[in-house]
Amino acid sequence: MVDEQLEQIEGVVEDIIYENEDNGYVVFEISGGGVLTVVCGIVGELHAGESVICRGRYENHATYGRQFHAQECETDMP
């Protein structure tokens, strides 16, 4: 099996679209490099205005379109 590298994106959390407090699954938007990206995954608690670094893969959801599925996400401390 080939171990694929994860892509990395970073930016500022603009909006929390959905959050499941029971399992930590979050759908949110980040802006970075002039682009707004929808990110989803089990990443825990996030807040609008936080800078984040996420690693994962882009996927096309049949209903919601292109999303970044984060396998890891951490707050980028200044």
Predicted regions and their residues:
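Short aromatic-glycine-enriched beta-strand elements
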Residues: 18-30
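Beta-strand/loop nucleic-acid-binding surfaces
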Residues: 27-47
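Structural detector for short beta-strands of small beta-barrel domains
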Residues: 4-20, 56
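A cross-taxa feature marking solvent-exposed loop/turn segments within ectodomains of secreted
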Residues: 20-23, 47, 61-63
